[in-house]
Design a protein with these regions (language model features):
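Hydrophobic alpha-helical transmembrane segments of multi-pass membrane transport proteins
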Residues: 9-16, 20, 69-91, 184, ...
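Juxtamembrane helix-loop boundary signature in multi-pass membrane transporters
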Residues: 1-8, 114, 118-179, 183
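Membrane-interface helix termini and inter-helical loops of multi-pass transporters
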Residues: 54-65, 114-126, 190-201, 224
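Structural motif at transmembrane-helix junctions in multi-pass transporters
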Residues: 30, 84-100, 197-201
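Hydrophobic core positions of alpha-helical segments in small-molecule transporters
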Residues: 37, 100-101, 128-131, 208
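Hydrophobic alpha-helical transmembrane segments of multi-pass integral membrane proteins
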Residues: 2-6, 31-54, 69-70, 173-181, ...
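Hydrophobic/aromatic residues within transmembrane alpha-helices
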Residues: 34, 88, 115-117, 205
Length: 224
């Protein structure tokens, strides 16, 4: 039950995070600068928490050498996910910016569980999992249909119906982008989960992920 409450709390926080970071984008006029600000603050916070809990941020050289290369790319996937959401928000709005990545997360999570990627425990696909995924897809369809119905009513009193039709068509590009970023997010979760096992600390794993993401963003934001 406690894990369910934590999961729900994280889910509630995601739309707020996306909205806040989108406002940051308006302030900095750059999605990368917005992401870098978010990651930098997160890195500092996680460093303090990790120091309080583990009393060290050190990672052994042998550990770095003996682990697969992909264990360190979780932060890069997080950068793609966060920056992608910032780009999606003005095109899809709050609801679809949240639900489209969820579709990608479910698809990728089922693949990761079924094949045991990233050293994850294997959970074969069964009818319950498939039905659950179909219910989520049904919810996504209903949410998109509701927005289309609302847009159609607005077109009745608008002279810009051709422009709105063009915008609706372009939304599918962003929806697919949302699904892809969601798949990256699910991969990041699995990778960081294994990193947490290796480091024997979930907080330190989160810190490492954020630190790598911050460094990548800093390198890409030199010309911003």
């Amino acid at each position: 039950l406690f894990a369910v409450i934590i999961g729900l709390s994280i889910g509630i926080g995601l739309p707020m995070q996306t909205a806040i970071n989108s406002r940051l984008r308006n302030a900095f006029s750059s999605p990368l600068l917005s992401s870098m600000t978010s990651f930098t603050i997160g890195t500092i916070f996680l460093a303090l928490v990790a120091l309080l809990i583990t009393h060290s941020l050190e990672i052994g050289v042998d550990l770095i050498k003996n682990q697969p290369w992909w264990i360190w790319v979780g932060g890069l996937l997080g950068v793609i996910y966060l920056t992608g959401n910032i780009l999606l928000f003005p095109h899809l709005g709050g609801v679809q910016t949240v639900i489209m990545p969820i579709v990608g997360q479910i698809i990728m999570s089922m693949l990761i569980d079924n094949f045991g990627w990233f050293y994850s425990p294997t959970h074969a696909l069964n009818i319950i999992r498939i039905l659950g995924a179909l219910l989520v897809l049904l919810g996504v369809f209903l949410a998109i249909s509701a927005q289309k119905l609302f847009s159609a009513r607005k077109e009745i009193i608008s002279d810009n119906s051709l422009l709105q039709n063009s915008n609706r068509n372009s939304q599918w590009f962003w929806r697919i982008g949302g699904i892809v970023t969601g798949m990256f997010s699910a991969s990041q979760t699995a990778i960081n989960g294994h990193l947490g096992t290796v480091l024997n600390s979930a907080v330190k794993a989160a810190f490492v992920s954020f630190l790598i993401g911050s460094i990548a963003l800093l390198d890409n934001c030199r010309g911003c």
